[in-house]
Swiss-Prot record:
NCBIfam families: PRK00132.1. The keyword Iron does not apply. The lineage of its organism: Bacteria, Pseudomonadati, Pseudomonadota, Gammaproteobacteria, Pasteurellales. The gene is rpsI. Belongs to the universal ribosomal protein uS9 family. The keyword Ribonucleoprotein applies. Keywords: Ribonucleoprotein, Ribosomal protein. This is Small ribosomal subunit protein uS9.
Amino acid sequence: MAENQNYGTGRRKSSSARVFIKPGSGKITINQRELDVYFGRETARMVVRQPLELVXLTDKLDLYITVKGGGISGQAGAIRHGITRALMEYDETLRPALRAAGFVTRDARRVERKKVGLHKARRRPQYSKR
């Protein structure tokens, strides 16, 4: 299976994605399902395709992706990060364009923890002056 393929790992929130890139016709498979079947939301599909559209390789590469953990948004972000890393392994000259678009940087934002005495992370109980 290791014939002429490139690999990239992507993470976002609590999601982790493993991306394998091979020369092909532009087929994207996520957890043995098509991209359109796996992600019902158009925004998630758009996020996944962003790095490929940026470097104009949408119909030249096949992608095989396994993703675990998190929700739709986190998984889409993790896949985008993994595709970016795999593309850089595939062709190092793509790095400046991907960096300029902000795809290379790992989004380190996490869910803030709930604090004692508050409703949520920052939401305080209603204050009554009298």
